[in-house]
Regions:
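Glycine-rich beta-alpha loop elements in corrinoid/cobalamin-binding modules
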Residues: 1-67, 273-275, 279
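Mobile, glycine-enriched helix-loop/loop "lid" segments at the mouths of ligand-binding/catalytic clefts
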Residues: 52, 56, 62-82, 283-305
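Structural motif
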Residues: 1-4, 179, 241
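Radical SAM enzyme core and accessory elements
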Residues: 52, 281-284, 291-372
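Radical SAM [4Fe-4S] cluster-binding motif and immediate context
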Residues: 74-239, 246, 251, 259
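Flexible glycine/acidic-rich beta-alpha junction loops that bind and position SAM and/or redox cofactors
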Residues: 8-12, 107, 111, 210, ...
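Non-cysteine beta-strand/loop elements that form the S-adenosyl-L-methionine
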Residues: 28, 189-207, 267-276, 296
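Structured loop/turn residues at beta-strand edges in well-structured enzyme cores
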Residues: 18, 42, 143, 195, ...
C-alpha cells in the first residue's frame, strides 16, 4: 500500500490488518519498482513490512528523488492499461490526460496533505525538454486526448520555467490546463494563454483574510481578486476551490466567502469541508485545540459518499458547517448571470451540452444526497 496515510502512520497501518504485507513510505516510485522486481523486503529503502514472524519492520528511509527526469513517462502506461475515455472530470475537456512535471510545493498551507506527507516543500522539477517530450508523445500517440492537465501542486511556482514550457506547448499545438496559485503575474498569464492554456485550477479557500493568514496561504484576497480580473481579461477559465470550516471560521466569514466567490466568479467551483488529515499542521492544531480526538478516525464522508464536517467549534458546529456547503453551491450557481453563462456555453457546443447536462445531473444528485 502507498500514499499519505501509510507514509505518516506505517506502524498503525500494518497493525490494523493482516491483509497488508508492506507499505511504502515517502516517495514510493522506486520502492515499488524494487519490490516488483523481487528485491528482498529487508533491503528495500523506504519500506515497512511484516516479517515472517509477524513483527513489523521499518527499513531506513529512501532518499528524496532529486533528478525527476529519472521517472519514466506515465502516458504510455495510460495508453497501454487504460481507456482514457472512461475517465471524466467536469472542468476538463474529455478525454484528458493528467501528468506531473514536478513534485513538492513551496507553499505552507496548513491543511494541504501531499507536501506535508510525501512530496515535501521543495519543488523538484523535470527538465523542460523532458516535459515537452512526453506531451509530444501524447499528441502523436493518443490523438483522442483533447487536453493535457499538469497536476503539480502549484505548476506556476517557477515563472520563467512555466513560460518556457508554455512556449514549447504552443509550438506543439496542444490544449492544456494546470493548477495555479492566485498570484501569477499578468505577463506570465498572457504567455500561457497565447500558447494553449485553457483553464486554471485555483485554490481560493476563503474570502476572509484572517483565515488565509491562519492557514498560511501566503496571499490575501486583494492579490487573488487582481489575478481573477487578469484571467477574465485574457479569457482564461478558472475552476475555483473553496474550503469551509477552517480555523477562524464563523457564520460571518462563511457569508463573506460566498460573496467573495461570486465576486471573483470562477466558471465553476468546488467547495470542500476542512479535513484534518494526519500528518498535516491542521491535524496537529485540531488535536491540540480539542477540535478532534487524537488517533480517532474522523469520518470525512458518509456511507453515501457525501463529505462530512470533521471539525467544529464552540461557536460553529459541524452540523452548521455541513449545511452551509449546500447553501454555498446554490447561491453560487442559482444566479441568472451564472445560469446564462452555462447555457450560453451549451448552445455553441454539442460537447459542452453533453458535459453540462451530465454535471447538472450529478449536481442535483449531490443536493438530494446532502439534504438526506
Amino acid at each position: 500500500m502507498v500514499g499519505a496515510k501509510v507514509a505518516v502512520e506505517p506502524q498503525a497501518s500494518l497493525a490494523a490488518t493482516a491483509a497488508i504485507d508492506f507499505v511504502c513510505r515517502e516517495e514510493f516510485d522506486f520502492t515499488c519498482k524494487e519490490v516488483a522486481e523481487g528485491a528482498p523486503l529487508a533491503q528495500v529503502l523506504g519500506l515497512s513490512y511484516r516479517a515472517p514472524d509477524g513483527s513489523i519492520k521499518h527499513n531506513d528511509p529512501r532518499p528524496i528523488l532529486e533528478n525527476m527526469d529519472e521517472l519514466k513517462f506515465v502516458a504510455p502506461i495510460y495508453k497501454r492499461d487504460l481507456k482514457v475515455e472512461n475517465y471524466f472530470i467536469g472542468y476538463l475537456k474529455h478525454p484528458y490526460v493528467s501528468i506531473y512535471t514536478g513534485r513538492g510545493c513551496k507553499s505552507r498551507c496548513t491543511f494541504c496533505l501531499w507536501p506535508q506527507t510525501v512530496g515535501g516543500h521543495r519543488y523538484r522539477t523535470r527538465s523542460v525538454a523532458h516535459v515537452l517530450e512526453e506531451v509530444k508523445w501524447i499528441r502523436d500517440n493518443m490523438p483522442e486526448v483533447k487536453e493535457v492537465m499538469f497536476d503539480d501542486d502549484t505548476f506556476t511556482d517557477l515563472g520563467p520555467r512555466v513560460e518556457e514550457i508554455a512556449r514549447g506547448l504552443g509550438k506543439l499545438g496542444v490544449t492544456w490546463s494546470c493548477n495555479a496559485k492566485a498570484n501569477v503575474p499578468y505577463d506570465t498569464l498572457k504567455i500561457m494563454k497565447e500558447n494553449g492554456l485553457r483553464l486554471l485550477l485555483v485554490g481560493y479557500e476563503s474570502g476572509d483574510d484572517q483565515i488565509l493568514i491562519n492557514i498560511k496561504k501566503g496571499l490575501l484576497t486583494k492579490t487573488a481578486r487582481r489575478f481573477s480580473e487578469d484571467c477574465r481579461k485574457l479569457g482564461i477559465r478558472v475552476h475555483g476551490t473553496f474550503i469551509l470550516g477552517l480555523p477562524g471560521e464563523t457564520q460571518e466569514t462563511i457569508e463573506k466567502t460566498i460573496q467573495y466567490a461570486k465576486e471573483v466568479n470562477p466558471l465553476t467551483i468546488q467547495v470542500s469541508l476542512a479535513a484534518p488529515y494526519p500528518g498535516t499542521e491542521l491535524y496537529k492544531q485540531a488535536v491540540e485545540k480539542g477540535w478532534l480526538e487524537e488517533n480517532k478516525a474522523a469520518n470525512l464522508v458518509s456511507a453515501g459518499g457525501v463529505q462530512l464536517a470533521a471539525i467544529g467549534y464552540e461557536h460553529l458546529s459541524r452540523k452548521e458547517i455541513y449545511h452551509h456547503l449546500e447553501t454555498f453551491y446554490k447561491r453560487f450557481y442559482f444566479r441568472p448571470a451564472k445560469i446564462w453563462e452555462i447555457v450560453r456555453e451549451m448552445l455553441v457546443s454539442w460537447e459542452m451540452m453533453k458535459r453540462r447536462l451530465r454535471e447538472g445531473v450529478e449536481f442535483f444528485r449531490f443536493l438530494r444526497a446532502h439534504e438526506a
